[in-house]
């Protein structure tokens, strides 16, 4: 039997970290060799998450570079923004492959990162090596990458909805409007007033209107796809459910003669080799429940011939395809494995 790949998770006690643990425990080719969580160092992981205690007996450890390099070949950094860039250079120097789930290595230009996220960066050479970790768009680059900046849930759902339109030049890029709705787990596990049950239940609210930090990330990739500078109108909303994301995208068509069947044919061809994307048939629109617990993004669309606009909808699990599952999908590519290996494709229903 082939030796299993030894992987580590830094930030193992958060929502992203525990999703990585859950998914990797069912991955046939890996072994979890290290769990890093400074605030819970010395605590058995099974005490933090008793539902997993029968599957993993590892103790959370302090985050120490030498220990990670000694224990692992691959490491996932499921840390808040601003931490990964202090760890990645040393991990790469130690010969590890690094998958960063934060925003630290998603940007081509570090000045853009600093203007939206703040903080000082002294890792420009390392950042230039990073590959944007959306497999459906950058699969071949990811295969050979040592450092992957994995996109989050809003960019993933938005970009998968927009990519065929921009790549094929089907829309006026200046008309791109993205309305996004996320479950409260997208805010992470740290205590925040807006995530409290009494605040979030039975309420839908927009936030960070015209200034959400994922805007420049979405625009960076949209511009790359379109071959020109693209600006988007992006508005996120918090909805009263634990997990799930629904994006509704609107754009003006360049060819008003296109109909929904034409657009579906274009999307099906674009994602034909993308096992994590399901393009739905005519008149079928995605629901967040379909994607719950899976690494699948569902896409539906309609052409409004009256307004000459296309409406594209995408639904995914913000903690799986929007975070941890996507990182594992990228890891699979770097190892030459089938990219959905170990990843769930069928959700819970009802």
Curated annotation (Swiss-Prot):
One of its GO terms (cellular component) is cytoplasm. It comes from the Bacteria. The keyword Glycoprotein does not apply. GO terms for biological process: L-arginine biosynthetic process. InterPro entries: AGPR_AS (IPR023013), AGPR_type-1 (IPR000706), NAD(P)-bd_dom_sf (IPR036291), NAGSA_dehydrogenase (IPR050085), Semialdehyde_DH_NAD-bd (IPR000534). The keyword Kinase does not apply. It is an enzyme of class 1 (oxidoreductase). Its main location: cytoplasm. It is found in: Cytoplasm. Keywords: Amino-acid biosynthesis, Arginine biosynthesis, Cytoplasm, NADP, Oxidoreductase. Pathway: Amino-acid biosynthesis; L-arginine biosynthesis; N(2)-acetyl-L-ornithine from L-glutamate: step 3/4. It holds the Pfam family Semialdhyde_dhC_1. Its EC number is 1.2.1.38. Signal peptide: none annotated. Belongs to the NAGSA dehydrogenase family. Type 1 subfamily. Catalyzes the NADPH-dependent reduction of N-acetyl-5-glutamyl phosphate to yield N-acetyl-L-glutamate 5-semialdehyde. This is N-acetyl-gamma-glutamyl-phosphate reductase.
């Amino acid at each position: 039997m082939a030796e299993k790949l030894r992987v580590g998770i830094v930030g193992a006690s958060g929502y992203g970290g525990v999703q990585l643990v859950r998914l990797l425990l069912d991955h046939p080719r890996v072994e979890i060799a290290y769990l890093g969580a400074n605030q819970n160092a010395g605590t058995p992981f099974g005490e933090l998450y008793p539902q997993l205690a029968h599957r993993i007996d590892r103790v959370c450890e302090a985050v120490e570079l030498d220990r990670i390099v000694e224990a692992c070949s691959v490491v996932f950094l499921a840390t808040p923004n601003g931490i990964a860039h202090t760890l990645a250079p040393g991990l790469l120097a130690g010969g590890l492959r690094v998958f960063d789930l934060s925003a630290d290595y998603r940007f081509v230009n570090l000045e853009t990162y600093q203007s939206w996220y703040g903080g000082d960066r002294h890792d420009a050479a390392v950042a230039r090596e990073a590959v944007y970790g959306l497999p459906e768009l950058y699969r071949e680059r990811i295969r050979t990458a040592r450092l992957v900046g994995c996109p989050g849930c809003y960019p993933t759902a938005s970009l998968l909805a927009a990519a065929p339109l921009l790549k094929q030049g089907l829309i006026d890029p200046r008309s791109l409007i993205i309305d996004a709705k996320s479950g409260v787990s997208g805010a992470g596990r740290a205590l925040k007033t807006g995530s409290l049950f009494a605040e979030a239940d039975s309420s839908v609210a927009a936030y960070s209107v015209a200034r959400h930090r994922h805007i420049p990330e979405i625009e960076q990739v949209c511009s790359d796809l379109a071959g020109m500078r693209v600006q988007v109108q992006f508005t996120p909303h918090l909805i009263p459910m634990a997990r799930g994301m629904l994006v509704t995208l609107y754009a003006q068509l360049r060819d008003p003669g296109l109909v929904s069947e034409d657009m579906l044919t274009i999307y099906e061809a674009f994602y034909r080799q993308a096992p994590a994307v399901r393009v739905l048939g005519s008149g079928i629109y995605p629901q967040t429940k379909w994607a719950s617990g899976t690494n699948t993004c569902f896409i539906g669309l309609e052409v409004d011939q009256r307004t000459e606009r296309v409406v594209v909808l995408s639904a995914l699990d913000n903690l799986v395809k929007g975070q941890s599952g996507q990182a594992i999908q990228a890891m699979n590519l770097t190892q030459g494995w089938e990219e959905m290996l170990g990843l769930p494709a069928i959700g819970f229903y009802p």
